[in-house]
């Protein structure tokens, strides 16, 4: 049983590199601005990219996608009629705080052209800036 605890910490807006290199895939999507994404928004982004990749490849190629972003926030909410001093409220969703330079997705089995098409679609759907990255060729 997983217990989701309420978080009280706020995240600093300092530029810190901890998840800025590709670990598994050959291509990836990197974030260039601070942002907070809820679990529903992240699932929507993931479903859009999967759907677009399946349409492009025609289910013929083996495509792998990794997302290494941990959910580090719990979003809580009290009812609108609650008075002061009644606590923080119930957890209604999870989210994570993104810093510039963090990798959102890593891809394997995707061409550079397909990745640019995916990123152009995701730029229209999200409020943060996205850039494509790739491993240097040997």
Curated annotation (Swiss-Prot):
DNA damage keyword on record: no
GO biological process, alphabetically ordered: mitochondrial translation
Gene3D superfamilies xref list: Ribosomal protein L10e/L16 (3.90.1170.10)
Keyword terms: Mitochondrion, Ribonucleoprotein, Ribosomal protein
Places the protein is found: Mitochondrion
Residue ranges that the Swiss-Prot or TrEMBL entry lists as coiled coil: none
Single GO cellular component term: mitochondrial large ribosomal subunit
One MF term in the entry's GO annotations: structural constituent of ribosome
Protein origin, superkingdom: Eukaryota
Pfam families: Ribosomal_L16
CDD domains: Ribosomal_L16_L10e
Family, similarity comment: Belongs to the universal ribosomal protein uL16 family.
Protein name (Swiss-Prot/TrEMBL): Large ribosomal subunit protein uL16m
Organism field: Chondrus crispus (Carrageen Irish moss)
């Amino acid at each position: 049983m997983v217990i989701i605890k309420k978080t009280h910490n706020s995240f600093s807006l300092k530029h810190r590199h901890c998840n800025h290199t590709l670990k598994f895939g050959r291509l990836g999507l990197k974030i260039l601005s601070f942002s907070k994404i809820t679990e529903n928004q992240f699932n929507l982004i993931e479903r859009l990219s999967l759907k677009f990749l399946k349409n492009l490849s025609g289910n013929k190629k083996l495509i792998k996608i990794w997302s290494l972003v941990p959910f580090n926030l719990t979003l809580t909410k009290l009812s609108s009629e609650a008075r002061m001093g009644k606590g923080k409220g119930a957890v209604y969703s999870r989210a994570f705080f993104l810093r510039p330079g963090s990798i959102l997705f890593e891809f394997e089995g995707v061409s550079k052209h397909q990745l640019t098409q995916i990123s152009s679609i995701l730029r229209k759907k999200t409020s943060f800036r996205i850039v494509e990255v790739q491993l240097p060729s040997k």
